[in-house]
Amino acid sequence: GNLDARRDWGHARDYVEGMWRILQQETPDDYVLATGETHSVRGFASRAFAAAGIELDWKGEGLAEKGVDAASGEIRVEIDPRYFRPAEVDLLMGDAAKARERLGWTHTRDLDSLVGEMVAADLELLGREGLPRAERMA
């Protein structure tokens, strides 16, 4: 997919807290729960590999761009055109000002802690179950 796409990633625990606060209101209303920060898919991938102890070097451009393990030279990330969205939105970012002002809600976890938690959970699962079935069959 598009490594340049920028997204507003946030932690589910923060969003559940926001939803709970919304449900406590006397009058129903619409709220946006978001971090107000964007990060590229490339940056997310770099953070995820770093959390697993792998530094990526990005080489090439466009469809030929690859994330290469800086230590081993092994290709870790390749672009697959099947994952490009037909109507790609380059930037998705929310404005949670209303939730902050009326609910006192704001996100409390940054992207690095989110990515670290996700990678740790995957590494734990990998340690318990080994490679996913599709990887074993390859």
Where are these regions (language model features)?
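C-terminal substrate-binding subdomain of Rossmann-fold SDR/epimerase-dehydratase oxidoreductases
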Residues: 1-138
